[in-house]
């Protein structure tokens, strides 16, 4: 009975407590749950925003966007499963969209290659005419730099040979690296449509950048729709609860990584000191062996057995 009452109190508390920092605060599209809701909300504006975003990022006009389940199982129980932020179909294409804030263990490239192959495998079924096979796209909005050596902020990857000729263009990966977009001018006339989206993701929730965001919205219909959706979903307390929980989990993960790194550094220092001590002792043993050998009372073989070190470590053959 007491347990039921506690759960009831927690539910009431969640509904009555506000997580919104101020009455006009906006959700952050870079938070996983907000990004998903922004493009999958049951409103025509969200659908139009997603359609326009795909058109701008792929570089071709798209229509008839159809949302798909965002979880794909493997063919075998041992296969990795895929869970996407957004999964959708458009004419002749299947698209997975992700927003990613951290490159855990520098393995994001491997994860993405698996995802795009998994999508393609899922939608190409037995007996399908290869002419009907859909192109697969994996689009990632990255809040970290994936490739330091690449200057472009939006990069397109596909299977090509050493001369740049592609095979069939069926597996496609697109990375939008937001840290590279920050340095671009905050002038809509100097930005491409997909760069405008990058600026929107970066500044949509920033109260000091709202004039610029509204300027982007005037010149990009998709961003105009996204601004409308963001304003609407920011009125819903449950969305603030989800975003708050998300940022808490991000902070916890960063703290765990930082703590693990600190422990690793400390352990490394301890191991280094121990290794240095051992090396010092070993060097002293070698010096003693050389003295004994020079004294002539013992043979090199006898010294080696006595001090448990190889002959070559203290005796130079002439």
Residue locations for each model-derived region?
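Accessory alpha/beta interaction modules
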Residues: 1-173, 182-184, 259
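Short, charged alpha-helical interaction segments and adjacent helix-coil junctions
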Residues: 2-26, 91, 95-100, 202-318
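Generic secondary-structure boundary/loop-capping signal
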Residues: 32-36, 74, 116, 127, ...
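Non-catalytic, well-ordered alpha-helical scaffold segments
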Residues: 32-33, 48-51, 110, 136, ...
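Generic structural signal for hydrophobic core residues of well-folded globular domains
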Residues: 38, 42, 57, 179, ...
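Short intrinsically disordered coil segments
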Residues: 153-160, 189-197, 245-247
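An acidic, glycine-/histidine-flanked metal-binding catalytic module
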Residues: 169, 174-218, 224, 229
